[in-house]
Amino acid sequence: MDFLLLGLCLHWLLRRPSGVVLCLLGACFQMLPAAPSGCPQLCRCEGRLLYCEALNLTEAPHNLSGLLGLSLRYNSLSELRAGQFTGLMQLTWLYLDHNHICSVQGDAFQKLRRVKELTLSSNQITQLANTTFRPMPNLRSVDLSYNKLQALAPDLFHGLRKLTTLHMRANAIQFVPVRIFQDCRSLKFLDIGYNQLKSLARNSFAGLFKLTELHLEHNDLVKVNFAHFPRLISLHSLCLRRNKVAIVVSSLDWVWNLEKMDLSGNEIEYMEPHVFETVPHLQSLQLDSNRLTYVEPRILNSWKSLTSITLAGNLWDCGRNVCALASWLSNFQGRYDGNLQCASPEYAQGEDVLDAVYAFHLCEEGAEPTSGHLLSAVTNRSDLGFPAGPATTLADDREGQPDSTPEPVTVALPGEHAENAVQIHKVVTGTMALIFSFLIVVLVLYVSWKCFPASLRQLRQCFVTQRRKQKQKQTMHQMAAMSAQEYYVDYKPNHIEGALVIINEYGSCTCHQQPARECEV
C-alpha cells in the first residue's frame, strides 16, 4: 500500500510544472530532521551526541541544532537564560551538572518537549520557578541534588506525569509543600535526604501511588506519623535514619505493603503499641542506635513477618520488663545483630540482654510486677527446647480491651540440665581439638617422610650419634669414679697355653681383690 501511494504521488508530481515540484520538495526537506552542525572546537561529537565537558565554558555553544544529547558538565556556567536551548527541539537528554549555575530563568528550557533526562546536580541553585519544567512534559528523570534549594515552589512539578525518578538530596529544603507531587503519578523513586526538614504535612506525598522507594534520611524530623504517608500502596522501602525522631505513632488505621524500614540513628524513646500493625509485610527493620529501654509485647506480636532486625545501641533496661523481648529474641528465626547490652540497672550494665535474663533470674516466678505487667509461672517450655522447669509469662493486666491485650509471652530459664549440657559440650570440643592437633602432627610427619626421606635419614643418624656420645660420656664418668677409689688389686695371670694377658677386651685375666689395708708413711 505504501509503495502504491508513493507511485501515485510521483505520477502526480511529474504532471505538474517544475516550479510547483521544486516548492513541494523544498517543503519536504524542511520537515526532515536537521543534521547536526559542525562539532565545536575542543568538544567531542558522537553522531548526534555532543560532549563539551571540563572546558571551563561560561556559556553554552551557539548554533547547535539536530542534537539528541548534550553534555556541558564540569564547566563554569553561572546562569541559564531564557530561550538558551531553543534550537535543540530534538534533544532527549541534557547534562548540566558540576557547574556554577545559581540562576535558572523560568523559560530557560523552552521548546525542549522531547527531553527525558535532565541533570542539574552539584550547582548553586537557590530557587526554581513554577514554570521551570513546564516545557518538558516528557521528563522521566530529574536530578537536583547537591544544590542550595531552600524552598520548593508549590507547582514546580506540575504536569510531569511521566516522571519516574527525582533526586533532591543534599539541599537546604525545610518544608515539602502540600500536594506538590500530585501530578507525578508515575514516580517510583524519591530522594529528599540530607536536607533540613523539620516536619511533614499530612498530604505532602499525596498522589504517589507508584512510589516504591522514599529517602528522608539525615533531616531534622522529630516525630514520625505514618499518617504522613497516606495511600502509598506501592511503597516498599522507607529510609528515616539519622533524624531526631523521638516518637513513632500512627493516627490512621490503614495497611500498606512496606517491606523495609530504617529508623536507626534517631532518638526514639517511645513507639505506639499498634504502630507496626499497619505494616504486616515488614521484613527488614533497623532500630539500632536509639533510646529504647523496652519494647511493648503488642509490638513484638506484630513483628511476625520480620526476617532481619537491628536493636543494638539502645538503652535497654534489664529489669522485669525485658522478659518479653528476651522471649521474642529466643524464638526469632531471622537475623539480628546480637549485641544488645543492658544500660540499667547498675548490676547488669554491659551485660548481654539474654545473658542477664538467665544469669540474674530476671523472669523467675515470684518477681514483682512492674509497669502494669504480671509475671506468672509456666511449666511448658518445649517451644524453646529446654526441659520442663520454671518459666514466666508476661501478660497485659488491662481487661476489656481486646485490641491492646497481647498474647502471653513465655521466657524459659535454663536449669541444671542446660548447665550440664554446656559442660559436656566444652569437654567434647576440647577432645576434638586434641585429636585434630594429633592428626595434623601425624600428617606433617608422613608428608615429610614421603617428600624428604634423605633429610629424615640424616636427622635419625644425628639422633643416634648423639645417643652414642652420651653413652660414652657416661662410661668415662663411671671409670673415672672407679679409679678414684684406693683399692689394692692383686692379680695372677694364667699361664695357660694360648692365653694372652691383654687388657681392653683382647684377652682374659683373673683378678683377686684383697681387703683394703692402711699403710704407714
UniProtKB/Swiss-Prot annotation:
Principal subcellular localization: membrane
Residues in LRRCT domain copies: 314-365
Compartment(s) where it occurs, according to its Swiss-Prot or TrEMBL record: Cell membrane; Postsynaptic cell membrane
PROSITE patterns recorded: LRR
Residues annotated as transmembrane: 427-447
Cystine residue pairs: none
Glycosylation, residue list: N56, N63, N130, N380
Topology in the lipid bilayer: Single-pass type I membrane protein
A GO CC annotation given for this chain: GABA-ergic synapse
Superkingdom of the organism of origin: Eukaryota
Signal sequence bounds: 1-34
Every LRRNT domain range: 35-63
Stretches of the chain found on the membrane's Extracellular side: 35-426
Sequence ranges on the Cytoplasmic membrane side: 448-521
LRR repeat segments: 64-87, 89-111, 112-135, 136-159, 161-183, 184-207, 209-231, 233-255, 256-278, 280-302
A family per Pfam: LRR_8
Keywords: Cell membrane, Glycoprotein, Leucine-rich repeat, Membrane, Postsynaptic cell membrane, Repeat, Signal, Synapse, Transmembrane, Transmembrane helix
Function: Exhibits strong synaptogenic activity, restricted to excitatory presynaptic differentiation, acting at both pre- and postsynaptic level.
Annotated family: Belongs to the LRRTM family.
Protein name: Leucine-rich repeat transmembrane neuronal protein 1
